[in-house]
Amino acid sequence: MRGSQVPRILVVEDELMIVLMLESLLLEAGFEVADVATKVEAALAFVEAGAFDVAILDANLAGVSSAPVAAALTARSIPFLVVSGYATAQQNGAFAAGLNVQKPFQTETLIEALRSILSASATE
């Protein structure tokens, strides 16, 4: 993370209602939403730009796996949460480096997971 600045989050999610809910709860928790991507290609462009500290990644974007995004995040050592309705299935392959948060999730669970991976990445 960049100094003492507010942590910036990339949200990769294709459902508008979930995006709006995430933006609201992240702001309330003291985070900044850096960007929102609804498709794999857009998410990969944001990862390439790297203007965020952590990502929240939906495992499935309108029927398309976001595994390429997870792989790109891992290659750049950017921490991420995998938010998915699929229990442990997404913990394999490219998603293995992320912390899994199952949908539907409690707000506290998501915020605690974000703080945990940000804290872990700050000590590396």
Residue ranges and their predicted role:
Residues 39, 65-68:
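Acidic catalytic/metal-coordinating carboxylates
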